[in-house]
């Protein structure tokens, strides 16, 4: 007080620094959390799914599960013909995933020698969880893919100069190649096979070391120029000659053309040919500034380099999403400030309201400055914490101002009133503030994994804000009181809103003391009713995302060709493209998109899969489009399922039921029985399992006698069949920095290969000039083989899943299907079941939350016990926390919100509010009872009357502070606003009526 100029200087500097920090602080959509997933891919050409399972997948699983960091229960493997995928998930406590994956990669490099010799590769992808900050397409119908790739390479070179840009990756590029279409009849006539042809071309594609010539002064390297410069040179390449000088060239036995091969996959943007560039951002940078830097480079590139017939389009733009999100939350923040100040003006004397209102921007901007210094970014979570705590930061000031006015009313000087009000209430305010802050921290220790990462900064943001507001209340507010509030404030004619509320409260309080046990019974009844209502609420720990964007996934049967997938995708595209609410449609046919949202995992795609990224005109239009098309188009095509997928913060299926066992037939029988029941439920669609139907393979069994006589081994036969039936790379031609693969292909003009024609394939023998049809040395017949064999935690597991129709309740459907499994489904011997999907995710999340809350309550218990030193009061305070339930659950029920992670944060905030109010009320009662020697009944009655106004004002400001959050339309944060608003109002009524009565009963 005596050095107020220094205090004001420090506060002013911190305030200005906070404004500067708001512009400079790193901004994100969500906190950076670790996606502890990766995929290990094993390639085993020629092996059936059963062979892949036994010889590759099982050894890989056993090896990977020797690492203690691997979460075995979530690690799955999929074995299919020639390949296996092992989806590896790390334990939640792993923070440095790069270190773990480095160990796994080194281990796999050594372990590969223990796998069968036929295993071609074991590849680890540990950046599976990396999310693209920006997806850009370069599209043109008049330019070739080579030209588009050239423009993309130029753009990439420019973007790499931006410090924050990382991981520039191209997608959708079609490779130009030199195709050699072999004529099998001519090859057979000359007595040579594809092996000779491929060997001759492969030797010309090498870049050999020519040595060097050196003398006493110089050393000159020898360079052998490549003989293949294009398709003409390839066609003229000699592949055979005899002593008489007769030669056989490639063009004599094959047709050589430069072309773009029929693609296995491709990307289109709004129906136009395009290539895509995926960009990520380095950690610790401001993504909004990142977007501005990229914009500047793009504008320069388009103006200087790009022709008019090449367009640049943004598909997914995290910088824009974050910018809009931050702008929306800052708008809500300032609107909430204005609402709180307006409410204070209505409920508080004008000058007192001005003093309290000053602390709102001071506390907020100083807190942002401290967050910037501490490295806490501005994202959806920290902004939500700022809004949630906004109404609470003025509470300390209101209590101090109310005490100041009380001292003035008793005739004390302004100086004495200002100093004594701050000194008297500081211990209670400190205890209440610490209790509120401490409530949030245990959840950081009990929640691990992605959710733990997600909430890391929430408690710190609240703590910084509340502690700053406490310091302002006891260090700055006293001087502002002297400066602004006169000794005797003029009384307005008539009664204020606060006076009317106080008069009503006195009558209610008198009634509650006359009917004490009835009042307590009503409080208990409210808790029971709230629990009954809570049991009827939906449970979903994380909601759907509010985006002007959604995805469409198209699934066909596993053996569907790309042409059929493209036809279905084109039909869906035309409908969406003609919809005025759709801004753009990006098609991924035969492939999946990069991860453009953190919780949207890319699919392992094939020719039977297509995906769209659809950008719409607004979030509401996204909902309307999904409502219109999702159910109507799901089964529009008889051979395809079209899934309209709303972007979700939950990365697990809604419904998932697992069957474990060792026998595939038993697993299929159990799964088929459940699927038959589920297909009768109108709420479900696309009921399926992850085990696809068996598919046919051609089984070639060499005759051991005939094949051995000709020197044909299994390996030699496999090489010949691969050369005859597939596209085989045999070399490369370089045109500057542009690589042209040379590929040996079958000439489809001679007719498509049929299953019956496989036996006519000529097999080259080690015996010179001898080639024989395959049917002469082997039996060729089609057989059935498993398409996929899935393991989970090292065991065979078949998973049944289904999509919910719009509006269906996942929790109710899970319960209904679980009853069918328990009561109606007869499981074969050795088969066990397990619930997965959203049910598993929710029940993995709830125990850590409950543990965190339990620890918080224990901490609060000891804080209150140390302060009051009486078990009775402590137990009453703990029991009073349940009074927040009634208003909160009624509010959630009326708003039709689910109980989830964010609504739980709202409940935790309510607990802190109630603890603060109870401490303020009971501390006053204890002072009157001990110091003034009043009876417990009189002390409780006076505490109710005296503390009702500050409790009413603090609760009102906290409740109205979240009104913008309630009506902001966010499915993520609106439940927090509803919980705090409705729960705060409900708990206010119950606390000020029931708590005084309970105090009087403690000492009776």
PLM features: residue spans?
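Signature of alpha-helical transmembrane segments and their immediate interfacial
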Residues: 1-27, 423-425, 437, 479, ...
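Solvent-exposed, non-transmembrane alpha-helical starts
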Residues: 9, 48-55, 93-103, 132-135, ...
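Hydrophobic transmembrane alpha-helices and their membrane-interface caps
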Residues: 18-24, 338, 342-346, 350-405, ...
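Extracytoplasmic/periplasmic membrane-proximal domains and adjacent transmembrane bundles
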Residues: 83-85, 112, 158-338, 401, ...
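Helix-loop junctions and hydrophobic alpha-helical segments within the transmembrane domains
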Residues: 315, 322, 326, 401, ...
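Transmembrane alpha-helices and their membrane-interface boundaries in multi-pass membrane transporters
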Residues: 390-404, 425-446, 453-493, 612, ...
